[in-house]
Curated annotation (Swiss-Prot):
DNA-binding annotation, residue ranges on this chain: 317-341, 424-447, 476-499
Record has Cytoplasm as a keyword: no
Annotated segments matching region SNAPC2-binding: 1281-1393
GO cellular component term of the entry, any: nucleoplasm
Name of the protein this chain belongs to: snRNA-activating protein complex subunit 4
Sequence positions bearing Phosphoserine: S68, S599, S626, S1224, S1398, S1400, S1440
Gene3D superfamilies referenced in this protein's UniProt entry, alphabetically: Homeodomain-like
Species this chain originates from: Homo sapiens
Effect noted on mutating D441N: In NEDRSO; uncertain significance
Effect the entry attributes to changing K185E: In NEDRSO; uncertain significance
Gene Ontology process terms (BP): snRNA transcription by RNA polymerase II; snRNA transcription by RNA polymerase III
Example GO molecular function: RNA polymerase III general transcription initiation factor activity
Biased composition (Basic residues): 503-516
Alphabetized UniProt keyword annotations: Disease variant, DNA-binding, Intellectual disability, Nucleus, Phosphoprotein, Repeat, Transcription, Transcription regulation
Length: 1469
């Protein structure tokens, strides 16, 4: 419109106004015109949508009419009606018109700008937009350009759906856009919250604003003052309400969950059409509203949900959510139910699905673009993310799998340097054939510069365990972030190794890569975001590790749990037991019952018990099976029964039942037979494995290729390198594990007890049976004497003239072997027949062997095999061996020296006169004592006599002794068929015996003696406390603590008179002449003819002889009457016997015949079977020291001479020794040293010599370097540790007594004995309730507790009770530990495999195999070395042939001796 025309129009309106108005209404006209102009301007400024459409517009006529109606108002008639007033009014009108014209011009300019901007937008112009805060046109928001593209401009409704759309809607098929579910981002959630608050605020303020506007309009129209004041008051209230609404908090503005909002406005304006209104509403009402519980679901809540949903039939989820009452929405309840519903869980991809996906991708792909969303239509039950994962990770033909080539690694490193370590989607394009997950894993786990490869040190392992405790299993990324230079996969692999997971088993059970089924839900796929590579790798790793984490959860808790759970004693009771034999102990029956063991008939060999599966041929009666013939692959029932020690009491029941039903005979295979088989198998296996390991790799060049062909040589070298790198590690690992398993088997076997197997005849028995003697003969022929530390120790101990020995060897090398002398007599036949009856006695740990068994000597192979390593049991009838036709064997140095000494002794005896022997003492049948050696004026021990220690036996308490490779043990007891033949018991060379007995190793071994003789030996440089405390102090060896008395025994041991002579001390002479047959001097053991010895009293002042004469009277029945009344026994010893039935191999043999032996009558304990005691066995015993207060304060000078302080063995005090001996202040005996010997005072002998002071060549004086014992020959430990070991400071501490109690041997406390004791637990508890009197006895539980309290109250200070309790705990502690161990093949959490290195461990493994080869010789028939009195029965010497220690606490000690690198064989104990 033109401005001039508008001005003209206004002018006309003014004239019309002047004509209408009279002079009195000019003020009112101006006021109304001004208000109308202001209202018009305000109306123009307000948005069109804010106007109230209900108010009709007011026309100018009505407005002027209203004004004319009010002209009679008296207040409007105040202006004068003159021309001057009219001129002034005209000037006012002109100013108003100018203002209106300026405003109109401004509006026209703005309109033109808006038109131009709109035209630019429609034309596609990108110019800057000018916004004045007004609402945008409908075509400027994003929703205008979305579907439907063609819609009505007024209603916004699009065209009707076509036929295709209607068909899809009828079938429920959604559009592609509806299938796309985009994850809500955080900024979108914040925007939704802000939008809801804004919409709510606008809904609350809109009525108030309209009300306020109406009040303002009405106020302007009223003329009454009262109405105006009322309207003003209402306006102020409306403004206050608006102000209160603006001050409402955000939580109040959010409203309820189901409140209605303008979702279309929020979708179009706030979200600009990116989210649909329905999607926004559902997300707000089901997930995002603050009233909805967004915390994790608890297990209790999930269980309640399952129950409530089942009650409602899995329908009406709104009611289910309300009934659940945890502020969960119905959608959340349904979603959680679907997650835990197994029927809705997606399964692995099938081959049909893989084939369909491959076909669809090939048909529908366009170049490199694959329309996964369209393919989803044809893949029922799968979403697009699953298709992407399956195709890109598994089915893509261009995807490479397996090892990475060096070229690929180089490309990967270049791509990482180019794009960084995050953008794996771009990096995969640089490495063709590899996915983003493969590239990421390869780089982070293998190629990263900060990764550390190789072995884990101890610090890293400790840190790994701490981090696993902190974060738990499965959080390997967090663990690796705090563990420097280690990746998550390395931590997982190390944890699996620590948990004992076998890699071979894992490789067999692990599925191939192409069969891995990727299954991820749509929500997880939508949550992956833009980082496709990282999300795929994390999903794949999580799915692969999920079963491993589930399996590893329990092992982790077992490994890292700081708590220790002690199960109830009732859980230890065996669940099953044999119906025919309810309980059978390995060492004898419990509760006084006879030993329930089925023995073969007399004359049959105990070796018949070898099982068929173990390839031990069952020998006929009288025959014997050689352990040499047992193949190395023996893993039959014998090893399994030994390994499955926790169920040893129940397993034989099935075999016995089957054997009884089949009518076959049952054989009780003793432990030593099982050990022989195992040792033979171990030796053969070790030899084979050692040779295979030492053999260099054979050339693999194929025939027909010349040696000069370079291609063939390179191929051969490549094959060798490949075989060396890949195969040697697994080979060494397998050898090492087999070696350790065999050692563990040998160590645990003695605690299993005897094995009962059916007697079956071997179907394929060779025509010519090679006996054990034949095998030993072959080994003796190959025996070589090597110089070893033990041989050096012998030479130092006995001061052997090596040069003279060599000369003697050279002189007698050509001589034929010496035949048995005419004085040799065969043992009585009844002694040979008595062995079968001894097999069933519980006192025997090892079986008797037939008389055809030949004496064995050590088989020395290699430089590390020790000379003088076996103890030997020789039979006096050498003609029996000659009849079988053995070839003559060369004699060893020890045999030649022994023969030389015997010949010299016989020559001297011819010139000697009768020997006078005084006093007689009563001791046990096989007790051998050690008197002290008096010192010479020069300070070195005089060549006095001594008697060797012999491990002694008690009723029902067999002991196991381990044979040492250096002659560490020799037996005193019965042989296989001749129980009356005694073999010499030499002192051990290991710290075991030094700690147990307090004695040092003995010298060479003497010939086998009968029970009527005492084997003695007197080296000049005695060792330890066994010969004299002074000798041990001189050599720096600590004295061992005294023995503790054992539990009482119901039957006293048979005793025989022992004639001892030591003229230096007071004696009481007897008138009974005693024959003496052996005398030990510095030159050796000398036989004395019986007629040449006369027993006469000797004055007390006469000088003592240099030799000690001792003999045992023939039978017990002949001497029982001469014993006289015996003093009451303070305590009968209950000690395990020595291993009487071993097959020792001595390092020195002699053909000197044994004197005639006499059969001893069987004790009553043997007759009834309750206590097994065999005459000839040795019993370590001593008296219980009576409590005394001044015994420790007494000086050594106050002690009586040694001859008056001899202990009483077997609970019998010598008849010639009074209760209180002279010189004992308190009349009681103090605790004695090893084997009951006191700390004896030193005595200086006079210049005179006794009748038996034989002439001998003077021995060379040892120098300072030869006088002291080299502790390095005893043990590889330090000198301080060896001396502590020798001091015997280990064992079970007995409270209130200040002493230690040695552990019991395995034969006494086997698993069978423990299981039998547990089977009688209820009966023992029932009997214990009889101790309680009164009303408490009626209640079983209260009676048991009352009886326990009674025992604690009355016996807590009783020494006998304390000893009995300590003995019981010492007996059954180790079997209880073994009962918790699983057998071979059963995985436990602590079964950590030993790790073997790659190249640096060949020497260690070879040394281990050599040790196993040396340990597994057939001559070694025992596996444990505990002996009564040893404070730690599990300790064994480094020079012995023991496999492993039986004490778990000493595994590390033995491990440091057998190998240089202990870290390669560390175990979690």
């Amino acid at each position: 419109m033109d401005v001039d025309a508008e001005r003209e129009k206004i002018t006309q309106e003014i004239k019309e106004l002047e004509r209408i108005l009279d002079p009195g209404s000019s003020g009112s006209h101006v006021e109304i015109s001004e208000s109308s102009l202001e209202s018009d301007s305000e109306a123009d400024s307000l948005p069109s949508e804010d106007l109230d459409p209900a108010d009709p517009p007011i026309s100018e006529e009505e407005r002027w009419g209203e004004a004319s109606n009010d002209e009679d108002d008296p207040k409007d008639k105040t202006l004068p009606e003159d021309p001057e007033t009219c001129l002034q009014l005209n000037m006012v009108y002109q100013e108003v018109i100018q203002e209106k014209l300026a405003e109109a011009n401004l509006l026209l300019a703005q309109n033109r700008e808006q038109q131009e901007e709109l035209m630019r937008d429609l034309a596609g112009s990108k110019g800057t937009k000018v916004k004045d805060g007004k609402s945008l046109p409908p075509s400027t928001y994003m929703g205008h350009f979305m579907k439907p593209y063609f819609k009505d401009k007024v209603t916004g409704v699009g065209p009707p759906a076509n036929e295709d759309t209607r068909e899809k809607a009828a079938q429920g098929i959604k559009a592609f856009e509806e299938l796309l579910v985009t994850k809500w981002k955080n900024w979108e959630k914040a925007l939704l919250r802000k939008s809801v608050v804004s919409d709510r605020l606008q809904r609350l303020l809109q009525p108030k604003l309209l009300k306020l506007e109406y009040l303002h309009q009405k106020q302007s129209k009223v003329s009454s003052e009262l109405e105006r004041q009322a309207l003003e008051k209402q306006g102020r209230e409306a403004e206050k309400e608006i102000q209160d609404i603006n001050q409402l908090p955000e939580e109040a503005l959010l409203g309820n969950r189901l409140d209605s909002h303008d979702w279309e406005k929020i979708s179009n304006i706030n979200f600009e059409g990116s989210r649909s209104a329905e999607e926004i509403r559902k997300f707000w009402q089901n997930s995002e509203h603050p009233s909805i519980n967004k915390q994790e679901w608890s297990r209790e809540e999930e269980e309640r949900l399952q129950a409530i949903a089942a009650a409602h039939g899995h329908l009406e989820w709104q009611k289910i959510a309300e009934e659940l009452g945890t502020s969960r929405s119905a959608f959340q309840c349904l979603q959680k139910f679907q997650q835990h519903n197994k029927a809705l869980k997606r399964k692995e991809w099938t081959e049909e699905e893989d084939r369909m996906l491959t076909q669809l991708v090939q048909e529908m792909r366009v170049g490199s673009h694959i329309p996964y969303r369209r393919i989803v239509y044809y893949m029922e039950g799968r979403d697009s993310m699953q298709l992407i994962y399956r195709w890109t990770k598994s089915l893509d033909p261009g995807l490479k799998k397996g090892y990475w080539a060096p070229e690929e690694d180089a490309k990967l490193l270049q791509a990482v340097a180019k794009y960084g370590e995050q953008d794996w989607f771009k990096i995969r394009e640089e490495v063709p054939g590899r996915s983003d997950a493969q590239c990421r894993d390869r780089y982070l786990r293998r190629l990263h510069f900060s990764l550390k490869k190789g072995r884990w040190n101890l610090k890293e392992e400790e840190q790994l365990i701490e981090l696993i405790e902190k974060y738990g299993v499965g959080h390997w990324a967090k663990i690796a972030s705090e563990l420097p230079h280690r990746s998550g996969s390395q931590c997982l692999s190390k944890w699996k190794i620590m948990m004992g997971k076998k890699q071979g088993l894992r490789r067999r059970r692990r599925r191939a890569r192409h069969s891995v089924r990727w299954s991820s839900t749509s929500s997880s796929g939508s949550s992956s975001g833009s980082s496709g590579g990282s999300s795929s790798s994390s999903s794949s790793s999580s799915e692969e590790d999920e079963p491993e984490q589930a399996q590893a959860g329990e092992g982790d808790r077992a490994l890292l749990s700081p708590q220790y759970m002690v199960p109830d004693m009732d859980l230890w009771v065996p669940a099953r037991q044999s119906t025919s034999q309810p309980w059978r102990g390995g060492a004898g029956a419990w509760l006084g019952g006879p030993a329930a063991s089925l023995s073969p008939p007399k004359g049959s060999s105990a070796s018949q018990g070898g099982s068929k599966e173990a390839s031990t041929t069952a020998a006929a009666p009288g025959e014997e099976t050689s352990p040499v013939q047992v193949p190395a692959r023996a893993h039959g029932p014998v090893p399994r029964s030994a390994q499955a020690s926790h169920s040893a009491d129940t397993r034989p029941a099935g075999a016995e039942k089957q054997a009884l039903e089949g009518g076959r005979r049952l054989l009780t295979v003793p432990v030593e037979t099982v050990l022989r088989v195992l040792r033979a198998n171990t030796a053969a296996r070790s030899c084979t494995q050692k040779e295979q390991l030492r053999q260099p790799p054979l050339p693999t060049s194929s025939p027909g290729v010349s040696s000069g062909d370079s291609v063939a040589r390179s191929h051969v070298q490549w094959l060798r390198h490949r075989a060396t790198q890949s195969g040697q590690r697994r080979w060494r690992h397998a050898l090492h594990r087999r070696l350790l398993n065999r050692r563990l088997l040998l160590a645990v076997t003695p605690w299993v007890g005897d094995v009962v197997v059916p007697c079956t005849q071997a179907s394929q028995r060779p025509a010519v049976v090679q006996t054990q003697a034949d095998g030993l003969r072959e080994q003796l022929q190959q025996a070589r004497l090597a110089s070893t530390p033990v041989f050096t120790l012998f030479t130092q101990l006995f001061h052997i003239d090596t040069a003279g020995c060599l000369e003697v060897v050279r002189e007698r090398k050509a001589l034929p072997p010496r035949l048995p002398q005419a004085g040799a007599r065969d043992p009585p036949v009844h002694l040979l027949q008595a062995s079968s009856s001894a097999q069933s006695t519980p006192g025997h740990l090892f079986p008797n062997v037939p008389a055809q068994e030949a004496s064995k000597s050590a088989s020395h192979k290699g430089s590390r095999r020790l000379a003088s390593s076996r103890v030997e049991r020789t039979l006096p009838q050498a003609s029996l061996l000659a009849s079988t036709g053995p070839r003559p064997k060369p004699k060893t140095v020890s045999e030649l020296l022994q023969e030389k000494r015997l010949q010299e002794a016989r020559a001297r005896e011819a010139t000697r006169g009768p020997v006078v022997l005084p006093s007689q003492l009563l001791v046990s049948s096989s007790v051998i004592l050690q008197p002290p050696l008096p010192h010479t004026p020069h300070g070195r021990p005089a060549p006095g006599p001594t008697v060797l220690n012999v491990p002694l036996s008690g009723p029902g308490a067999p002991a196991a002794a381990k044979p040492g490779t250096s002659g560490s043990w020799q037996e005193a007891g019965t042989s296989a068929k001749d129980k009356r033949l005694s073999t010499m018991q030499a002192l051990p060379l290991a710290p075991v015996f030094s700690e147990a007995e307090g004695t040092a190793p003995a010298a060479s071994q003497a010939p086998a003696l009968g029970p009527g003789q005492i084997s003695v030996s007197c080296p000049e440089s005695g060792l330890g406390q066994s010969q004299a405390p002074a000798a041990s102090r001189k050599q720096g060896l600590p004295e061992a603590p005294p023995f503790l008395p054992a539990a009482p025994s119901p039957t006293p041991l048979p005793v025989q008179p022992l004639s001892l002579t030591h003229i230096g001390g007071p004696h009481v002479a007897t008138s009974v002449p005693l024959p003496v047959t052996w005398v030990l001097t510095a030159q050796g053991l000398l036989p004395v003819p019986v007629p040449a010895v006369v027993s006469l009293p000797r004055p007390a002042g006469t000088p003592g002889p240099a030799g000690l004469l001792a003999t045992l009277l023939p039978p017990l029945t002949e001497t029982r009457a001469a014993q006289g009344p015996r003093a009451p026994a303070l305590s009968s010893s209950w000690q395990p016997p020595a291993n009487m039935n071993r097959e020792p191999e001595p390092s020195c043999r002699t053909d000197t015949p044994a004197p005639p032996t006499h059969a001893l009558s069987q004790s009553p304990a043997e007759a009834d079977g309750s206590v097994a005691f065999v005459p000839g066995e040795a019993q370590v015993a001593r008296e219980i020291p009576e409590p005394r207060t001044s015994s420790h304060a007494d000086p050594p000078e106050a002690e009586p001479p040694w001859s008056g302080r001899l202990p009483a063995f077997g609970g019998v005090i010598p008849a010639t020794e009074p209760r209180g001996t002279p010189g004992s202040p308190s009349g009681t005996q103090e605790p004695r040293g090893p084997l009951g010997l006191e700390k004896l005072p030193l005595r200086q002998p006079g210049p005179e010599k006794g009748a038996l002071d034989l002439e001998k060549p003077p021995l060379p004086q040892p120098g300072p370097e030869k006088g002291a014992l080299d502790l390095g020959l005893l043990s590889q430990e330090g000198e301080a540790a060896t001396q502590q070991w020798l001091g015997g400071q280990r064992g079970v501490r007995v409270p209130l007594l200040g002493s230690r109690l040695p552990y019991q041997p395995p034969a006494l406390c086997s698993l069978r004995a423990l299981s039998g004791l547990l089977l009688h637990k209820k009966a023992l508890e029932h009997k214990a309730t009889s101790l309680v009197v009164g009303g408490e006895a009626e209640r079983p539980a209260g009676a048991l507790q009352a009886s326990l309290g009674l025992v604690r109250g009355q016996l807590q200070d009783n020494p006998a009770y304390l000893l009995l309790r300590a003995r019981f705990l010492a007996a059954f502690t180790l079997p209880a530990l073994l009962a918790t161990l699983a057998p071979q093949g059963v995985r436990t959490t602590l079964s950590v495999p030993s790790r073997v290195g790659s190249e640096s461990e060949d020497e260690d493994l070879l040394s281990e195999l050599e040790l196993a080869d040396r340990d597994g010789q057939p001559g070694c028939t025992t596996a444990t070395c505990p002996i009564q009195g040893a404070p730690d029965s599990g300790k064994c010497s480094a020079s012995s042939c023991l496999d492993t220690s039986n004490d778990p606490d000493d595994l590390d000690v033995l491990r440091t001796r057998h190998a240089r690198h202990t870290r390669k064989r560390r175990r979690l104990v």
